[in-house]
Amino acid sequence: MKKLFVLIAAACMTCTAAFAQTVKPFKEGERAVFLGNSITDAGHYHSYIWLYYMTRFPDMPIRVFNGGIGGDTAYDMNKRLDGDIFAMKPSVLMVTFGMNDSGYFEYNGDKPKEFGEQKYQESIKNYQQMEKRFKDLPDTRIVMVGTSPYDETVQLKENTPFKTKNETIKRLVEYQKESAAKNNWEFTDLNAPMTAINQQYQQKDPTFTLCGSDRIHPDNDGHMVMAYLFLKAQGFVGKEVADMEINANKKQAVKSENCTVSNIKKNG
């Protein structure tokens, strides 16, 4: 498992340079709400993000809230904005949708192209209702997050892929990006870099996927990659966790960044 994680981490660094976006880091006291479906409801990737902040910035408390519900589409999310999401009083709101919105079984039916177009138009119409609500939140920073992919290419036993489903998802991600630009919101994409990692490793192992045994729900490795990509968009990749320099003769810290050095003793 450790070796696999190291390999995936290396793949992240080589596969994501072209997909990097800019999301402002969270600030002290902020309330970060992640709105989404079952992938968010699982509670992993945003808890990893929170853990990063807690361990790297222990004196800068933030609150992270899980706003995911399994099976949700943009239509469902819009219906629960007031009673659920806005009730959490977000200062930053991450918005992810598309997996359920894009549909499933009909992609293997007689008219997959027509079905994909229908679900795309339906999803955009539903999202636009949320977009209107978000515009009325002057004190809330909106971050559009392109969803993790539906993995059509992994070879899984007894699991026939819904061909071109992820193409519909990618169109929705592109619309999210355009919406963010139009409204001066922030945007980052999980779909493209995770797809690139999947396809890179599937060249050697066709059964490899970050998207779980159902092609939809990322496993723990997948959630760790999602957290990495989000933190990368916030500008943290490559930054030192802590840095210190000690003068042994003087028994004192010459340099201490993001850490505290005390009780220095010299032997010999």
Each PLM stretch: what is its role?
Residues 30-44, 70-73:
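Catalytic nucleophile-elbow at a beta strand-turn-alpha helix junction centered on a G-D-S/GDSL motif
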Residues 66-68:
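Conserved residues in the N-terminal Rossmann fold of short-chain dehydrogenase/reductase
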Residues 1-22:
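Bacterial Sec-dependent N-terminal signal peptides
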Residues 248, 252:
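Acidic two-metal-ion nuclease catalytic site recognized across multiple nuclease folds
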Residues 257-260:
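Extracellular or exported targeting regions of proteins
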Residues 26, 47-61, 72-224, 228-247, ...:
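Alpha-helical cap/lid subdomain in secreted, periplasmic
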Residues 21-32:
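Membrane/wall-proximal cationic-aromatic binding patches
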